C-alpha cells in the first residue's frame, strides 16, 4: 500500500509531499575531468564545476540489517540528539519510512549515581529503556557518529563534543546537524548555537546547517507547521548521511560524453570530508522536471543566488525501481531542464511505498570552509547567473502547471511597468500589471525602513520585477512593515477621498482595531496587574486611522475629478443587479468587448482586469469609491484565491479569499509597523495566530470567531515570557513563565 502523502507548508507547493519522507541528501564531490583518482584527491579550492549527486538503492527489509548487526559485519551509525527539541526530532526520525538504515538514536541522561549515560530512544512500540556508557559506545567502533543539536542543550554539549572528538580521532566520520532557533526565541539562544557551531568545526568532518527562521519569514505557516518542517529537514539530513556512510547503496559519477562510473565506500567518505557546510532544498512533482523546479524555487531552505556555493547535489526518489539506463534518462532530463553541461554524479532513491508517479527531488548546497577570493573562473560567478536565468524562465511555467493542477483557469495578461503610477486629473488610471506574482513576491531590501527591524526580519521597498537580475525571490508570500511599501495607484487618491456610502460597502472591509482579538470592554483586566500595560498600548494607538470615518473625511477636488466620469452615472443603475449593470457597461463600449482586459464600473468601484460574462474572472483590480483597493484573483465576480486588500487608512491584508471573504491564511500589515498572521474562517480569525508589534513584542496563541481564546505566549522586547489565558477576547489571567518552560 502506498504511503499517504500530505501537503508541505510551503505556500506554492501543490503536489502532496510525504511529510515524514527522509530523503537521502548526499554531499559534495570536488573533481576535475582527468580521472576518478584526481577527482577524489583534489581540494575544494581546486573545484571549478557544479556537481550533482543522486543515490541508487533498493530498500532492504529491517531483518537484513538486524542480521548484519548480529554478525558484526555491519556497524551501527550512532545519532546523538541534544537540545530542547530532542524529543520531537527523534519522533520524526523514528517515523522515517527507511527502516533499513542502521541507525540508533541516543540522548544524554543521568543514572542513579549521577553519572552521564546514553539512553537509547526506540520506536513507539518498544517501551524498554536501554542505556550505555559513552566509553562502551566508542569501544563498539561505530562507523559514524552524527550529532543533532538545537538550542537549550545546556551541559550536554561537553559530553557530545568529547564523543565527536574521539570518533574523529579514531578515523571514523563525525557529522553535525545544527538546528538554528527562531528569532523570537531571543539573541541568547542564537548566540548559544553559533558558539557551538564554532566549537564543532574543530571536532567534526562535516556540518549541515538548518536555519528554521526562514520558514516563518517566507511562508504562510503556523508555528506548529514550521516545527514539523524543521524536524523533517533534520530527518532528511540524518538519513542522507547514513545512506552514504553505510555503503548499502551504489554511487555513480557521470562525465559528459562518457559512461557512468561507480564509487567505492571509501571514496564516498573522502568526498564527505572535503566539505564543511551544507544547506538543503527539496520539492515534489508528478514528473522530474516539476520536482526539480519546486526544489529550487519553493523550498525556503534553498535560496537561489547563494554565494558560498561549491556544489549542488540532487537526489531523486520514486516508487519504481530504476536501473542504470533510467539513471541516464534522469541525467538527460536534468541537463535539459537546467541547461547544465558539466560533470554530474548521479543516481536515484527507490522507495516502493512512495505514491505512484511521484518524483521527490532534493538539492543540497555545499560549501567549504575555504573562501574563494578570485572571481575569475570561480564557480560562484558561473552559478549565480545560471540560477537567476532559469528562475526567470521556469517561474511562469511552474505557476501554469500549478494552476492546471488546481483546476484554475490560466490567465495571461500583459504586464505594464507603470502599473503603480497615478496620472493627472485629465487622464485615466494607466494600465497596471495584473500578475499573481505581485501577490506572492516582495523584495528583501529594507535599508530605508522608517521603523527599525530586528535581524532576520524581512522588509520591502517595492514589488519585484522579474526582469531585474539583482532581485532575489523565493516563491512565497513574505511579510514586512507596511511603512516600507511603495503603494500602488489609488493609494494617494484614497488618502484624500471622500467616503462613498453606496455599493462600496459590499466589497469594502472594516478596519481592524489594535490590539487584535481583544474585546473593547471597560471591565477588561480590571483586576489584573497588567491593566496599566494594556491601557498604555491601547492609548498609543488612539489615532484617527482606527476610526472608519476618520482618515477619509477631507475630499480632494483633484481626486474627485480624476474618477468623476467613471462614477457619474453608476448611481442610476443601483436598482440593477451587479451582473446586469456590468454587462451593460461592457456592451456600451464596443472597443472593450474584444479586449482581454476590461475596464468597467463594478459594485461601487472601477474594475480593470479579466472578465467573463460581464463578471470579474481571473486576475484584476478593483478601486472602490471609498479609496480602498482589492488586487488579486476573482471567480464568478467574487474575490477568490490569492489577493491583496489595501484599506483606506493604509493597512494591508495579503492572503487567500473565498466568496468575497478572507478565508485561509493571511497577513495583516498595519501602517504603523505591526504585523498579524492568522488562519481565517469565513472572514474571522480562527485557529493559530501570531502578532508582531512594532515595539518588538511577540504574541502566539489561538483565535476563535475573531477573538483571542485559550492560551497565549507573550514575549517582551527583553525576552521576558508571559502566559496569558483568554476567554472570548477577555483576558482572564497573566503570569510570568521561565524561558525553559
Swiss-Prot record:
<dbReference type="GO" id="GO:0010020">
    <property type="term" value="P:chloroplast fission"/>
</dbReference>
<comment type="function">
    <text>Together with MIND1 and MCD1, regulates FtsZ ring positioning in chloroplasts in an ARC6-dependent manner. Z-ring accessory protein involved in the initiation of plastid division and division site placement (might functionally replace bacterial MinC). Acts as a disassembly factor that accelerates fragmentation and depolymerization of existing FtsZ2 filaments by enhancing FTSZ2 GTPase activity, thus leading to the conversion of FTSZ2 bound GTP into GDP, a process which triggers FtsZ2 filaments destabilization. Prevents misplaced Z-ring formation at chloroplast stroma nondivision sites.</text>
</comment>
<dbReference type="Pfam" id="PF02493">
    <property type="entry name" value="MORN"/>
</dbReference>
<keyword id="KW-0809">Transit peptide</keyword>
<keyword id="KW-1002">Plastid outer membrane</keyword>
<dbReference type="InterPro" id="IPR003409">
    <property type="entry name" value="MORN"/>
</dbReference>
<dbReference type="InterPro" id="IPR036525">
    <property type="entry name" value="Tubulin/FtsZ_GTPase_sf"/>
</dbReference>
<dbReference type="GO" id="GO:0005525">
    <property type="term" value="F:GTP binding"/>
</dbReference>
<dbReference type="GO" id="GO:0005829">
    <property type="term" value="C:cytosol"/>
</dbReference>
<feature type="compositionally biased region" description="Polar residues">
    <location>
        <begin position="546"/>
        <end position="558"/>
    </location>
</feature>
<comment type="subunit">
    <text>Self-interacts. Interacts with FTSZ, CDP1/PARC6 (via N-terminus), MIND1 and MINE1. Part of a complex made of ARC3, ARC6, FTSZ1 and FTSZ2. Recruited to the middle of the plastid by CDP1/PARC6 where subsequent complex made of CDP1/PARC6, ARC3 and FtsZ proteins can form; this complex enhances the dynamics of Z rings during chloroplast division. Binding to FTSZ2-1 is enabled by ARC6.</text>
</comment>
<keyword id="KW-0677">Repeat</keyword>
<dbReference type="GO" id="GO:0009570">
    <property type="term" value="C:chloroplast stroma"/>
</dbReference>
<keyword id="KW-0150">Chloroplast</keyword>
<keyword id="KW-0472">Membrane</keyword>
<feature type="compositionally biased region" description="Basic and acidic residues">
    <location>
        <begin position="451"/>
        <end position="465"/>
    </location>
</feature>
<feature type="transit peptide" description="Chloroplast">
    <location>
        <begin position="1"/>
        <end position="41"/>
    </location>
</feature>
<feature type="repeat" description="MORN 1">
    <location>
        <begin position="612"/>
        <end position="628"/>
    </location>
</feature>
<dbReference type="GO" id="GO:0098562">
    <property type="term" value="C:cytoplasmic side of membrane"/>
</dbReference>
<feature type="region of interest" description="Disordered">
    <location>
        <begin position="539"/>
        <end position="558"/>
    </location>
</feature>
<dbReference type="GO" id="GO:0009707">
    <property type="term" value="C:chloroplast outer membrane"/>
</dbReference>
<feature type="repeat" description="MORN 2">
    <location>
        <begin position="630"/>
        <end position="652"/>
    </location>
</feature>
<dbReference type="InterPro" id="IPR003008">
    <property type="entry name" value="Tubulin_FtsZ_GTPase"/>
</dbReference>
<protein>
    <recommendedName>
        <fullName>Protein ACCUMULATION AND REPLICATION OF CHLOROPLASTS 3, chloroplastic</fullName>
    </recommendedName>
</protein>
<keyword id="KW-0934">Plastid</keyword>
<feature type="region of interest" description="Disordered">
    <location>
        <begin position="444"/>
        <end position="465"/>
    </location>
</feature>
<dbReference type="GO" id="GO:0009657">
    <property type="term" value="P:plastid organization"/>
</dbReference>
<feature type="repeat" description="MORN 3">
    <location>
        <begin position="653"/>
        <end position="675"/>
    </location>
</feature>
